[in-house]
Amino acid sequence: FMKQMKFFLVALMAVVMGMSVTSCMKGESESSYDLGLNATVIDDVMQVCLLGDDGVVYYPNNASVLKGTSGYPERVFVFLKYAEGVTSASTKKEVSIVQGGGLYTRSICLKPDTIKNDLPLVALTEVGVLDATTVNYTSVSAYCNVIFSLYLSNSAAIIDLVPVSAAGNELTVKLQQTIGDDKASNASSGYASFKIPSVSQINSVLASIAAEKGEEATSLIPSGGKIKIKIVATGKNGALTPLNTKEVKVN
C-alpha cells in the first residue's frame, strides 16, 4: 500500500512541477498494469531499459513512448504490464509501458553560491538511493531520491539538494526550496531525484564553501567506494528532523 501511495504521490508531483504524463491505457475494463515504479532510463546502444528503484532491470517493448523532443528523461515513473508468459519470477522482465512520465530530476547542486533562497519545508519523509553498479551498469549515475512535504501554491517550485559539509565518508546535504511562494501555507507532498556527482566535484564545492566562510575545507573520503548521505532541512520553526543516512556507491 505504501509503495502505491508513493507512486501516486510521484505522479501528482510530476504534474505540479509541469511534467508530461504519457498514457497508453487500453480500457477501463482491462487490468491495464501489473506494477508501478520509479526508474532510471538506461539508453543503451542495443536497447532502452529501465532500472527500477527496486533494483530490477525491466525491458520495455515500447520505450519510445517516454521519449521527448530532447530524448529520454533521466528518471521516470511508469506503470508496467508483463509481456505474455512473463511474471515477477522471470529472470528477464520483459514489459510494456502502460503509462509513464518524467520525474523531477536535478543534480546535487554544484553552484551553491547561486542559491539565494531557503524557503521552509514542512517535513522530510523518506530517502532512498539507487546505485546502477549493482546490475553492472557502471556508467549510469547514482541517485538520491527524497520524499518530503513543502508549502505550495499555484506558483512554480524548485527544490535543490545543496552540499553542506563532509566528515570522513559522510556527506551532509540540505534539501531547500529555492524557488516558490514564501507566503504559501498549503502543505503538499513531493518527490525529487538528485543525481550524485563525482567525489572530486563534491569536494570542489565543499572547498569553495569553506573558502567563502574563511574556514578550513573538509573533504569527502569514500570508504570502499561508498559514501553516506545525510539530508537535513529547515522548517518554519527551525531544523526539521533529519533522515537516516543512506550509503551508496559513487564514482
Annotate each language-model stretch with its function.
Residues 2-8, 14-45:
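Bacterial Sec-dependent N-terminal signal peptides
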Residues 34-251:
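First exposed extracellular module after export/assembly in secreted or surface-exposed proteins
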